[in-house]
Amino acid sequence: MEEFDRSISFDGRDIRLKLGLLAPQAGGSVLIQSGDTAVLVTATKAASREGVDFLPLTVDYEERLYAAGRIPGGFLRREGRPPEKAILISRLIDRPLRPLFPHWLRDDIQVIATTLSMDEEVPPDVLAVTGASLAVILAEIPFFGPMAAVRVGLVGDDFIINPTYKEINTGDLDLVVAGSPDGVVMVEAGANQLPEQDIIEAIDFGYEAVRDLIAAQQDVMETLGVKLATLDPPPVNESVLEFIKTQTADEIKKVLSQYDLDKNGRDTALDEIKAAKVEEVIASLPEEDPIKVATTEEAKLVDTLFKDVTKKLMRSQIINEGVRVDGRQLDQVRPISCRVGLLPPRVHGSGLFCRGLTQVLSIATLGTPGDAQELADDLHPEDEKRYLHHYNFPPYSVGETRPMRSPGRREIGHGALAERAILPVLPTQQEFPYVVRVVSEVLSSNGSTSMGSVCGSTLALMDAGVPIIKPVSGAAMGLIKDGDEVRILTDIQGIEDFLGDMDFKVAGTDNGITALQMDMKITGLSMDIVAKAIEQARPARLHILDKMLSVIDSPRPELSPYAPRLLTMRIDPDMIGLVIGPGGKTVKSITEQTKTKIDIDDDGTVTISASEAEQAERAKQLIHNMTRKLNEGEVYVGRVTRIIQIGAFVEIMPGKEGMIHISQLAEGRVGKVEDELAVGDEVVVKVREIDNKGRLNLTRLGIHPDEAAAARKAAALL
């Protein structure tokens, strides 16, 4: 392909597309650039593999620190495993791409986005999403595109497209909208308790910009003479399909309307129908029977068509009767139960949230500022995280066995969503200096575990005494769309997620929304449907919130007795070196004396943590004495550190030393300093003078007994 360069003027900032310049052996490659942020996106297809019955799509987002002019840390000085942010961007690219491939496509597809250059203003993620669409089209992979994505921010009262990092961090909204010509395909957002109507307007605003980017891609395609690749669906074996319908439809309907069955009971009943009404009957057919021949040649044909029949019957029941497989109405939430303080107090806070068969146990742990997660090895401007949420999904939660491995992309993504939902209601660092980690253990899963983690996190935080601004709850909305018939489902369970068209997670407080995530299985939704889903989620969220507040209605006034006790103080930044001491000697001495942990920020904020408040107070007093301004005439108890011919040096507090001249050791003439003092002696001294260089001249003369007694008493408290 010849080189092609096109600049798109887009909302006051150019987006530049370079095609045919890099990666010539990739199926399709696009270098997409805005400002000094440039992302190379490639798409490559391989032939389908035998036995694959799903879309084998892999999306990887890669960060290189050279993009920001940096060299990686560590011994190897090379990028290691992708940071969490890179994994989340991989998912962000994947989610709007996946529904736009024909679901019958079985070719291996790999999309790789690599950030080659990055400035401090333009995030690379939405560029990568848009670039992925064009790369797939150029690779001639069947695709219902083009697709594009933009970010929407809220600065003051105005929505803006593709805000800078600074505008994102200071605004009340960080929303990514992706869309196709058919409508909205993906939404992801964090918001500062914004009303539903504001969110709807923001999505609509973003989709209008998405349409401009889609039109720009279509213009590029027309210029290059590129058309969308297509792939006809494989023929359906109508005779086998009709056989399965005839054999099972009535029985499946009975199971789907047997509302007292739980997930496991329903799955078992459906498996029994398939075995008795299909598999056993086929086994009894003559070898030459066309049904037996077809199902023998294609091993997974029965499973595939039985699932299709079940899917159509479930969807038909919802559309025509307005009743779901568990008997709920379309807008009804499953039964909810909550508990707090379930675990012993060694755990700082815990909350158990149950919704139907979904059960999530969330545990909150309070840590010190030194426990914050440093983010130095990625390209993004955030330095550290003070709130961390980790989501675990063990195999037993769905009654399965499989090897236990490190968290996968799904677990990282669900954890990040629940983390994002809570962030807007956390107290500031000044109000609550603790670093907080919440771990959500999914103990049983039947849909909406990420929103269960949001609810469990809220319960655990309040149980731990974290003064959150407002409690947060969440619900997952689903969709059944058949032509013009549309049904939106509240609080979807596993089968509705699996056989439905949408998973739209909405979290927030009674004031407004804090997080959104919408994923589709169809090629796009109109804004009317998106708006209705958001509006229908509100009463569900508030219902869930009422259930949670009936168990604990506000954060506990006291922390767990096993949580660390923190004290904060401010010192002059110029004094930081004094407190730390050479090689950390001084601060280490204080921590050892007081059995505390001390963290010092560059702005002079000192955070002291200890298991007991008295220990923290003692360390605070030591640091205060070290850093406060000394005055002439003040009396201290010190210890002799060294002796020279003309006097002795005395440390009156960690890191602060003064000298007693030989003439100030005693009344009358002193022949040798050693006649009066030895190294290690405790001595009461007065500050006689502070010279213009800040040096302390001390004396043992003229100290009243009451002054000496007060100094000894103060020293004893330390």
Curated annotation (Swiss-Prot):
Known function: Involved in mRNA degradation. Catalyzes the phosphorolysis of single-stranded polyribonucleotides processively in the 3'- to 5'-direction.
Record carries keyword Secreted: no
Single Gene Ontology BP annotation: RNA processing
Location of the protein in the cell: Cytoplasm
PANTHER family listed in its UniProt record: POLYRIBONUCLEOTIDE NUCLEOTIDYLTRANSFERASE, POLYRIBONUCLEOTIDE NUCLEOTIDYLTRANSFERASE 1, MITOCHONDRIAL
Catalytic activity: RNA(n+1) + phosphate = RNA(n) + a ribonucleoside 5'-diphosphate
Family annotation (InterPro entries): ExoRNase_PH_dom1 (IPR001247), ExoRNase_PH_dom2 (IPR015847), ExoRNase_PH_dom2_sf (IPR036345), KH_dom (IPR004087), KH_dom_type_1 (IPR004088), KH_dom_type_1_sf (IPR036612), NA-bd_OB-fold (IPR012340), PNPase (IPR012162)
Highest classification ranks of the organism: Bacteria, Bacillati, Cyanobacteriota, Cyanophyceae, Oscillatoriophycideae
Family: Belongs to the polyribonucleotide nucleotidyltransferase family.
Name by which UniProt lists this protein: Polyribonucleotide nucleotidyltransferase
Residue stretches spanning the membrane: none
Keyword hit for RNA-binding: yes
Keywords, in A-Z order: Cytoplasm, Magnesium, Metal-binding, Nucleotidyltransferase, RNA-binding, Transferase
Coiled-coil ranges (or none): none
EC number: 2.7.7.8
GO cellular component term of the entry, any: cytosol
Domain of life: Bacteria
Cofactor(s) demanded: Mg(2+)
Pfam entry (one): KH_1
Molecular functions per Gene Ontology: 3'-5'-RNA exonuclease activity; magnesium ion binding; polyribonucleotide nucleotidyltransferase activity; RNA binding
Principal cellular location given in the protein's record: cytoplasm
Stretches assigned to the S1 motif domain: 633-701
KH domain ranges (all copies): 564-623
Top EC category: transferase
Binding residues for Mg(2+): 497, 503
